[in-house]
Protein backbone atom coordinates (compact mmCIF):
# COMPACT_ATOMS: atom_id res chain seq x y z
CA UNK A 1 0.00 0.00 0.00
CA UNK A 2 1.35 3.44 -0.88
CA UNK A 3 2.20 5.42 2.22
CA UNK A 4 0.13 8.49 2.93
CA UNK A 5 1.80 11.31 4.79
CA UNK A 6 -0.10 11.98 7.98
CA UNK A 7 0.76 13.86 11.18
CA UNK A 8 1.90 11.77 14.18
CA UNK A 9 -1.47 12.29 15.82
CA UNK A 10 -4.44 13.94 14.18
CA UNK A 11 -5.01 17.44 15.50
CA UNK A 12 -1.77 17.66 17.52
CA UNK A 13 -0.19 21.09 17.08
CA UNK A 14 3.58 21.45 16.92
CA UNK A 15 3.70 23.63 20.02
CA UNK A 16 1.63 21.16 22.02
CA UNK A 17 3.72 18.25 20.80
CA UNK A 18 6.88 20.03 21.91
CA UNK A 19 5.33 20.75 25.30
CA UNK A 20 4.38 17.09 25.68
CA UNK A 21 7.87 15.96 24.69
CA UNK A 22 9.67 18.19 27.17
CA UNK A 23 7.06 18.13 29.92
CA UNK A 24 8.25 21.57 30.88
CA UNK A 25 6.52 24.55 32.38
CA UNK A 26 4.53 27.11 30.47
CA UNK A 27 4.23 30.80 31.04
CA UNK A 28 0.88 32.41 31.71
CA UNK A 29 -1.09 32.93 28.49
CA UNK A 30 -1.47 36.58 27.52
CA UNK A 31 -4.97 37.92 27.86
CA UNK A 32 -7.26 36.68 25.08
CA UNK A 33 -5.36 33.45 24.42
CA UNK A 34 -7.73 31.14 26.28
CA UNK A 35 -8.72 29.45 23.03
CA UNK A 36 -5.08 28.77 22.23
CA UNK A 37 -4.64 27.10 25.60
CA UNK A 38 -7.79 25.05 25.00
CA UNK A 39 -6.41 23.93 21.63
CA UNK A 40 -3.12 22.92 23.24
CA UNK A 41 -4.98 20.90 25.88
CA UNK A 42 -6.95 19.11 23.16
CA UNK A 43 -3.82 18.46 21.10
CA UNK A 44 -1.93 16.93 24.01
CA UNK A 45 -5.01 14.92 24.98
CA UNK A 46 -5.15 13.42 21.48
CA UNK A 47 -1.47 12.53 21.62
CA UNK A 48 -1.84 10.87 25.02
CA UNK A 49 -4.99 8.99 23.98
CA UNK A 50 -3.19 7.68 20.91
CA UNK A 51 -0.37 6.44 23.15
CA UNK A 52 -2.62 4.99 25.87
CA UNK A 53 -5.42 3.62 23.64
CA UNK A 54 -7.71 3.88 26.68
CA UNK A 55 -9.66 6.90 27.88
CA UNK A 56 -9.80 5.46 31.42
CA UNK A 57 -6.00 5.54 31.61
CA UNK A 58 -5.90 9.26 30.87
CA UNK A 59 -5.56 11.64 33.81
CA UNK A 60 -6.17 15.37 33.71
CA UNK A 61 -3.04 15.79 35.81
CA UNK A 62 -0.97 14.10 33.10
CA UNK A 63 -2.54 16.33 30.45
CA UNK A 64 -1.79 19.44 32.51
CA UNK A 65 1.78 18.33 33.13
CA UNK A 66 2.35 17.71 29.41
CA UNK A 67 0.93 21.11 28.48
CA UNK A 68 2.88 22.78 31.26
CA UNK A 69 -0.03 24.19 33.27
CA UNK A 70 -1.67 23.59 36.63
CA UNK A 71 -4.27 20.83 36.71
CA UNK A 72 -6.88 23.34 37.83
CA UNK A 73 -6.42 25.19 34.53
CA UNK A 74 -7.81 22.21 32.63
CA UNK A 75 -11.08 22.49 34.56
CA UNK A 76 -11.53 26.05 33.33
CA UNK A 77 -12.19 24.60 29.86
CA UNK A 78 -13.50 21.08 30.59
CA UNK A 79 -15.78 19.96 33.40
CA UNK A 80 -14.26 16.49 33.70
CA UNK A 81 -12.26 13.84 31.87
CA UNK A 82 -15.21 12.67 29.78
CA UNK A 83 -15.86 16.20 28.54
CA UNK A 84 -12.19 16.60 27.63
CA UNK A 85 -11.98 13.27 25.81
CA UNK A 86 -15.21 13.89 23.90
CA UNK A 87 -14.04 17.32 22.77
CA UNK A 88 -10.68 15.90 21.68
CA UNK A 89 -12.29 13.03 19.77
CA UNK A 90 -14.71 15.38 18.05
CA UNK A 91 -11.83 17.55 16.86
CA UNK A 92 -9.91 14.49 15.68
CA UNK A 93 -12.99 13.27 13.84
CA UNK A 94 -13.45 16.67 12.19
CA UNK A 95 -9.83 16.65 11.01
CA UNK A 96 -10.24 13.10 9.72
CA UNK A 97 -13.37 14.02 7.76
CA UNK A 98 -11.54 16.91 6.13
CA UNK A 99 -8.68 14.60 5.13
CA UNK A 100 -11.11 12.01 3.76
CA UNK A 101 -12.76 14.67 1.62
CA UNK A 102 -9.35 15.69 0.29
CA UNK A 103 -8.54 12.07 -0.52
CA UNK A 104 -11.85 11.74 -2.36
CA UNK A 105 -11.08 14.86 -4.38
CA UNK A 106 -8.04 13.13 -5.90
CA UNK A 107 -10.26 11.59 -8.62
CA UNK A 108 -13.47 12.36 -10.48
CA UNK A 109 -14.45 8.69 -10.73
CA UNK A 110 -17.17 7.82 -8.17
CA UNK A 111 -15.78 4.34 -7.48
CA UNK A 112 -12.29 5.80 -7.19
CA UNK A 113 -13.62 8.36 -4.72
CA UNK A 114 -15.22 5.69 -2.55
CA UNK A 115 -12.09 3.55 -2.70
CA UNK A 116 -9.87 6.53 -1.82
CA UNK A 117 -11.97 7.24 1.28
CA UNK A 118 -11.72 3.66 2.47
CA UNK A 119 -7.98 3.41 1.83
CA UNK A 120 -7.32 6.67 3.64
CA UNK A 121 -9.36 5.49 6.61
CA UNK A 122 -7.29 2.30 6.73
CA UNK A 123 -4.04 4.28 6.65
CA UNK A 124 -5.32 6.65 9.34
CA UNK A 125 -6.15 3.74 11.64
CA UNK A 126 -2.68 2.27 11.12
CA UNK A 127 -1.10 5.52 12.31
CA UNK A 128 -3.70 6.34 14.98
CA UNK A 129 -4.55 2.92 16.38
CA UNK A 130 -4.93 4.24 19.93
CA UNK A 131 -7.37 6.95 18.91
CA UNK A 132 -9.32 4.44 16.84
CA UNK A 133 -9.72 2.18 19.87
CA UNK A 134 -10.94 5.06 22.02
CA UNK A 135 -13.36 6.16 19.29
CA UNK A 136 -14.87 2.73 18.74
CA UNK A 137 -13.86 0.31 21.52
CA UNK A 138 -13.66 2.36 24.72
CA UNK A 139 -15.98 2.44 27.71
CA UNK A 140 -16.71 6.07 26.84
CA UNK A 141 -17.93 4.93 23.43
CA UNK A 142 -20.26 2.47 25.16
CA UNK A 143 -21.54 5.03 27.68
CA UNK A 144 -21.88 8.04 25.40
CA UNK A 145 -23.57 8.69 22.08
CA UNK A 146 -20.96 10.37 19.90
CA UNK A 147 -23.30 11.96 17.38
CA UNK A 148 -20.44 13.40 15.35
CA UNK A 149 -19.43 9.88 14.24
CA UNK A 150 -22.66 9.55 12.26
CA UNK A 151 -21.21 11.86 9.61
CA UNK A 152 -18.72 9.20 8.51
CA UNK A 153 -21.53 6.78 7.71
CA UNK A 154 -23.54 9.47 5.95
CA UNK A 155 -20.59 10.40 3.72
CA UNK A 156 -19.99 6.74 2.84
CA UNK A 157 -23.65 6.32 1.93
CA UNK A 158 -23.49 9.41 -0.27
CA UNK A 159 -20.40 8.05 -2.03
CA UNK A 160 -22.19 4.75 -2.70
CA UNK A 161 -25.21 6.61 -4.09
CA UNK A 162 -22.91 8.40 -6.54
CA UNK A 163 -21.58 5.04 -7.72
CA UNK A 164 -25.15 3.82 -8.27
CA UNK A 165 -26.22 7.03 -10.01
CA UNK A 166 -23.27 6.75 -12.40
CA UNK A 167 -24.16 3.16 -13.26
CA UNK A 168 -20.98 1.85 -11.65
CA UNK A 169 -22.90 -0.19 -9.04
CA UNK A 170 -26.34 -1.86 -9.10
CA UNK A 171 -29.22 0.30 -7.94
CA UNK A 172 -29.96 -0.78 -4.36
CA UNK A 173 -30.63 0.50 -0.86
CA UNK A 174 -27.52 2.66 -0.48
CA UNK A 175 -27.90 2.96 3.30
CA UNK A 176 -28.02 -0.83 3.72
CA UNK A 177 -25.06 -1.33 1.37
CA UNK A 178 -23.16 1.37 3.26
CA UNK A 179 -23.77 -0.38 6.58
CA UNK A 180 -22.50 -3.68 5.17
CA UNK A 181 -19.43 -2.01 3.69
CA UNK A 182 -18.62 -0.09 6.87
CA UNK A 183 -18.98 -3.24 8.97
CA UNK A 184 -16.54 -5.04 6.69
CA UNK A 185 -13.98 -2.23 6.57
CA UNK A 186 -14.11 -1.52 10.31
CA UNK A 187 -13.78 -5.24 10.98
CA UNK A 188 -10.73 -5.42 8.74
CA UNK A 189 -8.97 -2.45 10.33
CA UNK A 190 -10.01 -3.30 13.89
CA UNK A 191 -8.68 -6.84 13.59
CA UNK A 192 -5.39 -5.48 12.28
CA UNK A 193 -5.15 -3.24 15.35
CA UNK A 194 -6.04 -5.99 17.83
CA UNK A 195 -4.41 -8.98 16.09
CA UNK A 196 -1.47 -7.47 14.22
CA UNK A 197 0.50 -10.73 14.06
CA UNK A 198 -1.96 -12.52 11.79
CA UNK A 199 -0.83 -12.94 8.16
CA UNK A 200 -2.91 -10.07 6.81
CA UNK A 201 -3.22 -9.48 3.07
CA UNK A 202 -2.72 -5.92 1.83
CA UNK A 203 -5.68 -3.85 2.97
CA UNK A 204 -6.28 -2.50 -0.53
CA UNK A 205 -6.88 -6.04 -1.77
CA UNK A 206 -9.53 -6.58 0.90
CA UNK A 207 -11.15 -3.25 0.14
CA UNK A 208 -11.31 -4.11 -3.56
CA UNK A 209 -13.05 -7.38 -2.68
CA UNK A 210 -15.50 -5.53 -0.43
CA UNK A 211 -16.30 -3.10 -3.23
CA UNK A 212 -16.97 -5.94 -5.67
CA UNK A 213 -18.91 -8.23 -3.33
CA UNK A 214 -20.79 -5.69 -1.20
CA UNK A 215 -21.22 -2.64 -3.42
CA UNK A 216 -21.32 -4.53 -6.70
CA UNK A 217 -18.71 -2.59 -8.66
CA UNK A 218 -17.02 -4.37 -11.54
CA UNK A 219 -13.78 -6.16 -10.63
CA UNK A 220 -10.59 -4.79 -12.13
CA UNK A 221 -9.23 -7.08 -14.88
CA UNK A 222 -5.76 -8.37 -14.06
CA UNK A 223 -3.00 -6.25 -15.52
CA UNK A 224 -5.29 -3.39 -16.57
CA UNK A 225 -4.86 0.05 -14.98
CA UNK A 226 -8.04 1.21 -13.35
CA UNK A 227 -9.60 4.51 -12.42
CA UNK A 228 -10.58 2.88 -9.15
CA UNK A 229 -6.96 2.39 -8.18
CA UNK A 230 -6.42 5.93 -7.10
CA UNK A 231 -4.17 6.66 -4.15
CA UNK A 232 -5.26 9.52 -1.87
CA UNK A 233 -3.03 12.53 -2.24
CA UNK A 234 -0.82 13.33 0.78
CA UNK A 235 -2.16 15.70 3.41
Model-predicted segments: where are they?
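Helix-turn-helix
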Residues: 40, 48-83, 87
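Hydrophobic alpha-helical connector segments
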Residues: 101-130, 181, 224, 228-230
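Hydrophobic alpha-helical segments that form the core
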Residues: 2-18, 172-194, 202-213
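Amphipathic alpha-helical packing segments from all-alpha helical-bundle domains
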Residues: 141-166, 175-179, 205-212
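Alpha-helical DNA-contacting segments of helix-turn-helix folds
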Residues: 85-92, 135, 152
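N-terminal intrinsically disordered/low-complexity leader segments
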Residues: 1-36, 221-235
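Short secondary-structure transition hinges
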Residues: 126-158, 194-197
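Generic hydrophobic, amphipathic alpha-helix propensity
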Residues: 37-45, 63, 88-92, 96, ...
Amino acid sequence: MDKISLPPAEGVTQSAARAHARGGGRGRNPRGEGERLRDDILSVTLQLLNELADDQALSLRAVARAVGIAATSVYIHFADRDALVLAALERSHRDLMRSLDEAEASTDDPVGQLRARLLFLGQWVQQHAGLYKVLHESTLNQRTHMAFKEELGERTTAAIRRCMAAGRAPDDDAAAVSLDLRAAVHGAVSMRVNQPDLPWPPLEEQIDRFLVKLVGVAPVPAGRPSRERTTPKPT
